[in-house]
């Protein structure tokens, strides 16, 4: 692991676009449905337990959370979508904010889409891929919680996910990931290194 990830620290949160930090430097955002393990993935990638808050309550992460690696580089935890028990008006606001962030944020240089390996490509995942394709953003898909399946089943799910992706977004890449047994951590770190311009 590059030591820069271990220097990650919470920088701030934004509920609206006006609260975002200055649009400069480089950011990689983590997106996904509620309770797919985005926060756990960020914690595992940085090696800092508890950096990004995790919760058994879906939708708990309702703000855009920024984690700073250095003066120019950030990891961003986007709001989870799908199960949050909030009014529809709030959900619409989240979607508008997310859409605007993806379309307008110049510092954004890549998206990590976190997908539960047992529930491949829900409507939100496909919407996210469409947003990224229209913007020309590179995407890395983490099939998280791969430890929940036996190796054969996990590899079968990976093949299925990869085949489907070739039809909808051939530029994206898919990998297995588990925050529990650390499957795929080095692979996603290598991708982040490339996007963020981090040396060895």
Swiss-Prot record:
Necessary for normal cell division and for the maintenance of normal septation. GTP binds at residues 32-39, 59-63, 77-80, 144-147, 177-179. One of its GO terms (molecular function) is GTP binding. Its cofactor is Mg(2+). Residues 24-198 form the EngB-type G domain. Keywords: Cell cycle, Cell division, GTP-binding, Magnesium, Metal-binding, Nucleotide-binding, Septation. SUPFAM superfamilies: P-loop containing nucleoside triphosphate hydrolases. Belongs to the TRAFAC class TrmE-Era-EngA-EngB-Septin-like GTPase superfamily. EngB GTPase family. The keyword Cell division applies. It holds the Pfam family MMR_HSR1. GO terms for cellular component: cytosol. InterPro entries: G_ENGB_dom, GTP-bd, GTP-bd_ribosome_bio_YsxC, P-loop_NTPase. It comes from Nitrosococcus oceani (strain ATCC 19707 / BCRC 17464 / JCM 30415 / NCIMB 11848 / C-107). It comes from the Bacteria. The gene is engB. Mg(2+) binds at residues 39, 61. GO terms for biological process: division septum assembly. This is Probable GTP-binding protein EngB. Signal peptide: none annotated.
């Amino acid at each position: 692991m590059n030591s820069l990830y271990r220097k990650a620290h919470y920088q701030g949160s934004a509920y609206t676009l006006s609260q975002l930090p200055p649009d400069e430097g480089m950011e990689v955002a983590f997106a996904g449905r509620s309770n797919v393990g985005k926060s756990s993935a960020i914690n595992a990638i940085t090696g800092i337990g508890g950096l990004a808050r995790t919760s058994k309550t879906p939708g708990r992460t309702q703000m855009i959370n920024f984690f700073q690696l250095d003066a120019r580089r950030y990891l961003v935890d986007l709001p989870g979508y799908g199960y949050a028990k909030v009014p529809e008006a709030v959900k619409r606001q989240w979607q508008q904010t997310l859409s605007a962030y993806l379309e307008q944020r110049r510092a954004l240089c890549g998206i990590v889409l976190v997908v539960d390996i047992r529930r491949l490509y829900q409507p939100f995942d496909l919407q996210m891929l469409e947003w990224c394709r229209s913007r020309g953003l590179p995407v890395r898909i983490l099939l998280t919680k791969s430890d929940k399946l036996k190796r054969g089943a996990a590899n079968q799910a990976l093949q299925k996910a990869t085949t489907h992706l070739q039809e909808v977004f051939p530029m994206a890449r898919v990998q297995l990931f588990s925050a529990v047994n650390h499957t795929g951590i080095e692979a996603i770190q290598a991708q982040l290194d490339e996007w963020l311009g981090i040396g060895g």
